[in-house]
């Protein structure tokens, strides 16, 4: 028999949320109504300007045997039962709620049982394809190292997860991989590249601003998700149309007519002008064709130009992504933030 069983989902207030009743029946426990929790739920709904529906009463039911697991994010509490040698835990299916409860209650419970967990290190990389990355670090991974290595690609890059029972072995291998990949690794542990870029800027006392076209404000959004970003990020302009590129950023009409909105020349002017407009130390710009329409033979869908200006200098990087609009926006924002990060490292 397993030591631990965890289920997720079905603890909501709707008719198809039947997990609570099924679990009560399976365990053979009675239940009662938690009046205090019901009052708490009503207060929480009232704070947001709503009257609580009667259907939510089911979320105030608690077993006469077993434990209730608190939920600091939502209204559905979890449940925990002991069935002979097996612990049964059921959690909400909403990812944000489930993750929060795992971190706040379940993982501490598991650790308290004396369960040993392997040592782990996460190396986050960007700007290097998975196959190229694996080939590049082969001199380190081909040797006997007694570690488990996992590769997790995303639109932002590739995460390398290294685990080992021995901390010294883990440290040695991760150090070798870090030496090989250098600045392709932007973070150790699960940190967003925006947080890294903001941290570098704050440490160096630098400020930056962004001029966005094809990303539609995504870069600014990612930056402002970082607490304290106002110490480095001055602001931005979403210049989606040519008219706004001219009036809002001062891109020359002759540049747009001769080279087009998606061009190195336009990206260059956008970066220089947003730098000047906000009196920043760095000006970041992106312009491209996110897709799936709008591409031409000369400028296919997925083409992107990223500009980075610093007083007296400006450089532009051309990238080619695929045909999926949302993915292109994510990848462009990541590449732009990485360009800023590298510039700050080498300042």
Q: Which residues does each PLM region occupy?
A:
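Short, Asp-centered acidic motifs that coordinate Mg2+ and/or phosphate
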Residues: 3-4, 282
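Glycine-rich beta-strand-to-loop/alpha-helix junction loops that act as flexible
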Residues: 7-15, 92, 164-165, 286-289
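Flexible gly/pro-rich beta->alpha loop and the following alpha-helix that scaffold active-site loops
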Residues: 7-33, 177, 181-190
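Conserved N-terminal alpha-helical segment that immediately precedes and caps sugar-phosphate-binding
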Residues: 16, 39-44, 48, 58, ...
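Proline/glycine-rich low-complexity loops and linkers
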Residues: 17-113
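Short beta-strand elements
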Residues: 80-81, 151, 305-310
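Accessory alpha-helical/coil subdomains and C-terminal extensions
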Residues: 82-156, 163-170
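Short alpha-helical segments enriched in small residues
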Residues: 168-347
């Amino acid at each position: 028999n397993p030591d631990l069983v965890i289920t997720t989902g079905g603890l909501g207030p709707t008719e198809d949320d039947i997990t609570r009743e099924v679990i009560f029946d399976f365990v053979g426990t009675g239940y009662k109504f938690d009046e205090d929790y019901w009052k708490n739920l009503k207060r929480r709904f009232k704070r947001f300007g709503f009257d609580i529906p009667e259907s939510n009463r089911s979320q105030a039911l608690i077993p006469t045997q077993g434990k209730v697991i608190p939920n600091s994010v939502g209204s559905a509490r979890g449940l925990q039962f002991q069935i002979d040698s097996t612990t049964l835990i059921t959690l909400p299916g909403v990812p944000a709620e489930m993750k929060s409860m795992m971190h706040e209650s379940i993982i501490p419970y598991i650790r308290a049982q004396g369960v040993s967990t392997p040592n782990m290190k996460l190396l986050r990389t960007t700007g290097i394809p998975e196959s190229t990355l694996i080939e590049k670090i082969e001199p380190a991974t081909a040797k006997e190292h007694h570690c488990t290595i996992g590769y997790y690609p995303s639109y932002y890059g590739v995460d390398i997860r290294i685990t080992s029972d021995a901390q010294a072995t883990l440290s040695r291998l991760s150090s070798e991989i870090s030496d090989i990949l250098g600045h392709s690794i932007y973070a150790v542990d699960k940190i967003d590249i925006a947080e890294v870029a903001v941290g570098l800027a704050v440490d160096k006392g630098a400020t930056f601003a962004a001029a966005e076209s094809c990303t539609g404000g995504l870069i600014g959004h990612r930056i402002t998700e970082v607490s304290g970003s106002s110490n480095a990020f001055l602001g931005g302009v979403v210049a989606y149309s040519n008219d706004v590129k001219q009036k809002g950023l001062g891109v020359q009409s002759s540049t747009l007519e001769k080279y087009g909105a998606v061009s190195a020349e336009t990206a260059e002017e956008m970066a220089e002008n947003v730098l000047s407009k906000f009196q920043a130390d760095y000006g970041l710009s992106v312009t491209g064709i996110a897709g799936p329409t709008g591409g031409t033979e000369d400028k296919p869908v997925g083409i992107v130009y990223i500009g980075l200006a610093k007083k007296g200098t400006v450089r532009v990087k051309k990238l080619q992504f695929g045909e999926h609009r949302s993915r292109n926006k994510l990848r462009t924002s990541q590449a732009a933030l990485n360009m800023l990060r590298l510039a700050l490292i080498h300042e």
